[in-house]
Design a protein with these regions (language model features):
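Terminal-appendage/accessory-domain detector
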Residues: 1-100, 200-210, 217-449
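Generic structural signal for well-ordered, non-membrane alpha-helices
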Residues: 6, 10, 34, 109, ...
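Hydrophobic face of alpha-helices
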Residues: 25, 29, 33, 107, ...
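Well-ordered alpha-helical scaffold segments within catalytic/enzyme domains
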Residues: 42, 111-118, 162-169, 215-219, ...
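Hydrophobic alpha-helical hairpins/lids featuring a short glycine-rich hinge
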Residues: 83-140
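Short connector loops/turns at beta-strand edges and beta->alpha or beta->beta junctions
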Residues: 86, 106-108, 113, 135, ...
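Short amphipathic alpha-helical face segments that pack within enzyme cores
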Residues: 105-113, 156-164, 211, 276-280, ...
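Glycine-rich, mobile lid/loop segments that gate access to catalytic sites or pores
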Residues: 116-213, 228, 233
Length: 449
């Protein structure tokens, strides 16, 4: 049996640009708008100016655009800056079933940076490259049968970057194998930074974008990497997953079905694990408009409860993953804005008062039971919501094109409006029609301030 690296390399090298179905193209266009929104919105997020200062101190000028700025860098630097910004707000796309991997911001950032460095590529070429890259990332992220604390966005997503960027550079199958092997030497990222509320979580996406491009460039120059990348004795899955993965998830339909369509777009700027509860909160608020609950009981799985941060969030990363904060914010105000998560201490006294009345506890019923939330009102009339069904933004419960466009506008406003309203409208048109562009330069030029 050949290593999965051979299968993925053959897929990446040989997939026809005409094999991207319209539903996949349409989803990728929305994913691109969504990713650009997150990048533009994150340009001033904590850690991003500091990263830019460090990188600019030793980076030469280049031809790849750093978005929402006047700066151009070599592709590896622009991709790192854009991908890090795109992950900073925890507002980028996600894979609900694959450990919460956020692949879009880093794959789009890397592919657009390389396209810039190549002088622009045709839209259909770009779409096929990103579709293959995201397909590879999704397949790898879905394969584990047990979680070992990896941040799959970076540790798994780097191989998606290789798939997309390698296609733009025209790698052969053999060169793809080497690129995957070199990427494996750099694949990393953990969730401890999430538990500790560290800014390094956002950096990990940028590292993967940068290192994926570097792996492809080295393979293209003739440098070799491990050939038994994924299934050798010390390969990715034996070492990183202790052999606990399902191979068929990766190989089934490979080359015939693109799984990028399974990626969800996030309607709320916080951890995806909170979104089902926020959907439920929105429904309850509509049903009881104007009523202030005396108490809110949230029942979640024991595993989630063990990881839950229940105290008042002191900073943005903690706020993005705080169940009591998100539920109180949505219930009290009917919104979940970037500004509120960015500065939790500045929220209204109503939110702070309601926060103290949110009680999170482990639910009964085993792993197959649904999370639920109970709103208890004065004088009775409790209202219970179960978080069953796909969360808003999932392909089976999609957000609208209008919602995604509004997200781009909101993110631009949050970042201090680095792009004019007219520029945003033009950017929306270019991104939604990316497959028909004569050159991706027509899109990235709109992101230059």
């Amino acid at each position: 049996m050949t290593d999965l690296a051979q299968d993925l390399a053959a897929h990446a090298a040989n997939f026809s640009a005409h094999g991207v179905e319209r539903s996949v193209r349409d989803h990728l266009a929305l994913d691109l708008v969504d990713g650009l929104a997150a990048i533009v919105g994150g340009t001033r997020a904590p850690g991003i100016p500091e990263l830019a200062q460090v990188l600019s101190a030793h980076a030469r000028p280049g031809t790849a655009q750093r978005f929402a700025s006047s700066e151009r860098y070599p592709a590896v630097v622009a991709a790192q800056l854009n991908a890090t910004a795109g992950h900073a707000l925890d507002y980028d796309d996600t894979l609900d079933e694959g450990g919460g991997m956020h692949a879009g911001a880093l794959v789009h950032s890397a592919a657009l940076a390389v396209a810039d460095e190549l002088g622009g590529v045709r839209g259909e070429t770009y779409v096929a490259a990103v579709a293959v890259g995201l397909d590879i990332a999704v397949r790898l992220a879905l394969a584990p049968t047990r979680d070992f604390g990896w941040h799959r966005t970076s540790a798994f997503g780097i191989f998606g970057v290789v798939g997309a960027v390698g296609r733009l550079y025209g790698l052969s199958q053999a060169e793809f194998v080497n690129a995957f092997g070199i990427a494996y030497s750099q694949a990393s990222g953990n969730r401890q930074c999430i538990a500790d509320g560290a800014l390094s979580k956002r950096l990990q996406a940028g590292f993967a974008a940068r290192d994926g491009i570097t792996a492809v460039q080295l393979a293209r120059a003739g440098v070799t990497g491990a050939s038994r990348v994924f299934e050798g004795a010390d390969g990715f899955f034996p070492l990183y997953q202790r052999g606990e993965y399902t191979r068929e998830v990766i190989t089934s339909g490979l080359g015939q079905q693109l799984l990028s369509r399974r990626i969800s777009l996030k309607p709320y700027p916080c951890g995806r694990n909170l979104h089902g509860l926020l959907d439920a909160t929105a429904r309850a608020r509509r049903a009881h408009e104007g009523r202030d609950p005396e108490r809110i009981d949230v029942f979640i799985s024991e595993k989630s409860f063990e990881r839950a941060a229940l105290g008042w969030p002191e900073h943005v990363v903690a706020a993005q993953f705080s169940i009591p904060f998100a539920v109180a914010l949505s219930t009290a105000t009917g919104r979940t804005s970037l500004a509120d998560f960015d500065a939790p201490d500045r929220v209204s006294t109503d939110v702070k008062a309601l926060f103290a009345r949110v009680h999170v506890q482990p639910r009964r019923g085993g792993p197959d039971a649904e999370d639920r939330i109970v709103f208890r009102y004065a004088g009775g009339g409790d209202h219970e919501e179960i978080t069953a069904g796909p969360r808003l933004g999932h392909p089976e419960n999609p957000v609208s094109r209008e919602h995604t466009a509004d997200k781009l506008r909101d993110c631009n406003a949050f970042a201090g409006a680095p792009l004019s309203d007219e520029r945003i409208d033009s950017l929306l048109s270019a991104a939604l029609g990316v497959a028909d562009l004569q050159s991706t330069s027509a899109l990235t030029s709109l992101l230059r301030r």
